[in-house]
């Protein structure tokens, strides 16, 4: 697979833009002390499932996981650090929001049939994981070359293990190595 500068630029743009969306949402919710209770209690199609997350004993955990999860997913995508680890959580969150916004067969505003931006974001994150986006002008490539990571298969798998060598992303000098 041959990558051009344009291809890498698109991967970085998608990663940073989707990451910013998560980062901003998480930051706003933390600063505003947002609670998901009203949102969860007004879900239509899967109300029984989502109502459990709004129960008084569970809601503080739901709020914490949503706020801080969005913030951490956003930081990961914007920086390109641990994209393979945070990506599936971003997909899970977007698919969960997708089903929470359904009023079968429509999505929330009745202008969309089946598809809304949550589903699009989930697919973009799948694309980013598949293309080792953390290695493309992100920190995954640099961290993967650190000796402690390079010699530990588990740690290496958290970054961009098995990524094509055409994603060198950040020069080795960034992590202190000289050639």
What do the PLM-derived regions correspond to, one by one?
Residues 1-42, 49-72, 79-179:
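Extended, low-polarity transmembrane helix blocks
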